[in-house]
Amino acid sequence: VEEDACTRPLTPHDCRLRDCTYAAPIYVDVEYTRGKELVVRRGHSGRVLIGRLPLMLRSSHCVLAGASEEQLARLGECPLDPGGYFIVKGTEKVVLIQEQLSKNRIILDLDAKGAVCASVTSSTHERKSKTHITARAGRLYLRHNSLGDDVPLCIVLRAMGAVCDQEIVSLVGGGANVAHLLAPSIQEAAVVGVHTQQQALDWLGAKVRLPRGNSGSGPSSSGAAPPAPPAAGAAAGAAPAGAPPTRARRSRADEARDVLAGVVLAHVPVDRYDFSAKVQYVCAMAARVLAAQADPAQLDDKDYYGNKRLELAGQLLGLLFEDLFKRLNAELRRAADTGLSRANRAGAFDVLKCIRTDTITNGLEHALASGNWTVKRFRMDRKGVTQVLSRLSFISALGMMTRINSQFEKTRKVSGPRALQPSQWGMLCPSDTPEGEACGLVKNLALMTHVTTDEEEEPLRRLAFALGTEPLPLLAGAQLGATGAALVFLNGHVLGAHRWPARFAERLRALRRAGRLGEFVSVHAVAGRCYIASDGGRVCRPLIIVRDGTPAVTDAHLAALRAKTLAFVDFIERGLVEYLDVNEENDSLIALTPAHVTRSTTHLEIEPFTILGVVAGLIPYPHHNQSPRNTYQCAMGKQAMGAVAFNQNI
């Protein structure tokens, strides 16, 4: 609103000058029943405002999106400004990229006592938890926070319905060697007298340990266990879809069944207490533990960049918005209960008048302004997620957009997470990192790195089955252990098995190059497993495809690119260039220059200097410098005097 009482659209530069937040209103359509009357508010006139969402500059809903240089100048914006930041109370704020260990993936590592351990961080829209399978004294144990102690693996498998010892051995891998390794674990279950599924559930019921009053997204607390032993579970787990309704008092076996269905390995679906998919997953984890005991080379490296995911501003704001929206609903429910309980109401009660628009607005603003991200449901409590955009120079602002923040403690003097990994080649800048305690923990993206977003899984699932993947319910353990067969994983979920994994991966890649699949879908086969990934947060980069020793991109293509008759997206659509993530790079042979291309080469680098970031890329002849000198210049180059932006004097 101007001085003359006229209104006009808000621009980012207005927000900078007036110390206000650049945000867009969130409108919803509302439909609810009042007595026997259906109240509907929708459309442009009837929609209801529930809050305001801070907008990222140059995003699709920003007024600057798609604007020409002339329009940007009229709006007081610099045409070279990259965007990608928020304006909160007049201050420019950047949400730093957050580095996380990948979810729903099996990671093999040594635990604190030196034992081989397979761990999975299960993450769903409801909860996040970690499950471990550990080898200790020749036996396998499952460990989870909801179970009091380490539980013998065979008891867990029996509770899931795998009662027969022969079935367990065949699912883990078959063969006399596997039977010999599993014998102590099977014997341990027999010693405690667990032979049937019901006995296993009763035994596990005494070990269930869930907090009392765990409501909302956690397991249902409507049926507390009898107060007999203190180790008994205090709350029941959330039953999967199609499960029988909860009773007032529940047996320990029911609690154990619900915990196995909805809490342990929560990302593996269980429908109507059919545990077959979860049994296969647990057995796959056990098989990897046994294989790693025999061959330590099969252990995973936690610092390997294929096991990392990057969280961007959209995911972080989405988590926060979901939490605030649930809080708004809870406040609205309480306000409606209070209003309807009044005996002296004069007119019809309108619940929409109780909606508070400041709950979501203030929650998002406070998080962006302070940098404190708190989501209780996922036990997330992070500090310093946002920082004030550095405007020392144009290059310092640009470099801050590509900064990656690790969750590792800066004070710990550990070299592993700080070291430069070979898997970071082409994905992260090898030079641009701060000196001192944050060295190696704060990193920067390389010039051509792309961070993926989530893609729909269902088309990939159908395609995998069409290309010969056999569904899990149709397979026995002997078929899974057949020579050459491989389990097919889609984003951490077991789809089934394929008899020719290398051929399956090649067909998927051919479809991706033909444009039938998303360009960021990744597929790679390794040691009896084939992984398809379409989840968000993976780092990938473009490479030129090489066929029979000849690069697909020719001089004619480059001339068309210079003449602007072809764009970069055309190279992707025509199958000349493709994006590879870190895992798929392991299946490729990449040449640095055309002179290095041989018959076995699969890809060619677009340009070797693209391994550097946006700041290190400005250093002249960096390969003639001692490496610490490049790191020092990355810090000092951001402090150079120069024009910050074209609009710095407005």
Write out the residue ranges for each language-model feature:
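Short glycine/proline-enriched turns and hinge-like loops at secondary-structure junctions
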Residues: 422, 439-443
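Active-site lining segments that contact anionic ligands and/or coordinate catalytic metals
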Residues: 425-428, 485
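Short, basic/aromatic recognition patches
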Residues: 412-420
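Active-site-adjacent loop/helix segments that line or gate small-molecule/cofactor pockets in enzymes
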Residues: 404-412
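N-terminal non-catalytic structural scaffold regions of very large proteins
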Residues: 1-233, 237-397, 407, 421, ...
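Conserved helicase core region in the C-terminal RecA-like lobe
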Residues: 428-435, 442
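Single, functionally critical "micro-switch" positions that shape active/binding sites
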Residues: 88-89, 435, 439
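Short beta-strand-initiation
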Residues: 80-81, 415, 425-426
